[in-house]
Amino acid sequence: MAANYWASTQRRHWLFTRERLAEIREAFRERHKLAHSQFPLPDQRLLNIYFSQQLIKLGKRMSTRQQALATAQVYIKRFYTKNEIRHTNPYLVLTTAFYLACKMEECPQHIRFVVGEARSLWPEFITPDVSKLGECEFSLISEMNSQLIVHHPYRTLSGLQSELSLTSDEVALAWSVINDHYLTDLPLLYSPHVIAVMAVMVAVVFKPGPGNFHGSAAPVLAGAMRDGGMNMLAALGDKSGNEPPPKVQKLINWLAESEVDIKAVIECTQELVSLYEVWEQYSEKNCKELLGRMVKTKHLDK
């Protein structure tokens, strides 16, 4: 997975503008008006939270590395830029993306084992017939044009740790922020290095007290980022004002000398703020009920 990102299919074929993503989704709404009216679904970010939590449950049963789960989330996003979710079984897509991601991230699982574990989690949505997963895998690979290598921000974060003298708490929080960005459209909009820099900035600027930041950063960051912290980010491009703390100043100096697009970093941070705001509306029960009704009514579990 160490291939050059700048020459990658991810950069050349799987980065979109916000406008293009909006056009794709609007086209789905226009083309599938009846399905959209019959089966309303929550905000896409709330669905992303639900899918992520289900992937984590599946991954824990097989001690799967975080990077494989992240790759699976990217596969799901890519697949749904080509397919209307209301004509699919999201549980099968999720399971298949997990199975394929494990192979690509060199932690493969046997297909029968994956199907068995998925059935133990979602018995009403996953058939014991392993050929269904095989068929879905073929569809997934086809829709992604066999472009399966995914570059993640985790690697850049590791490099920035020593360069910016990040503490273990800052690295842990930045790692959690990277985990959270997969719940948004950011993996389809920005390069991994921009996401990594955003995560470091958030960890350094908004860092709460020492703590354990495994999983999501939402609980510790939501309030800090919402309650005026964005002003400091806006000041990154401003030479006036009060002197920031030394660690923040070091980050600002590093950014000024780098070729990182500061505007893009700030846009990513704003997207994260929006995620943490909408997260307050999240209901696992609601997502499960709406998806379940859709799958069962349309017999997508067969």
UniProtKB/Swiss-Prot annotation:
Pfam families named in the record: Cyclin_N
Keyword Nucleus found: yes
GO cellular component annotations of the record: nucleus
Domain of life (superkingdom): Eukaryota
Gene Ontology molecular function, alphabetical: cyclin-dependent protein serine/threonine kinase regulator activity
Disulfide bridges in this chain: none
CDD domains xref list: CYCLIN_CCNC_rpt1
Any GO BP annotation: regulation of transcription by RNA polymerase II
Gene3D superfamilies on file: Cyclin-like
Keywords recorded for this protein, A-Z: Activator, Cyclin, Nucleus, Repressor, Transcription, Transcription regulation
Cell compartments where the protein resides: Nucleus
Transmembrane stretches, start-end: none
SMART domains: CYCLIN
Residues annotated as domain Cyclin N-terminal: 53-142
Protein family per UniProt: Belongs to the cyclin family. Cyclin C subfamily.
Quaternary structure note: Component of the srb8-11 complex, a regulatory module of the Mediator complex.
Name listed for the protein in its UniProt record: RNA polymerase II holoenzyme cyclin-like subunit
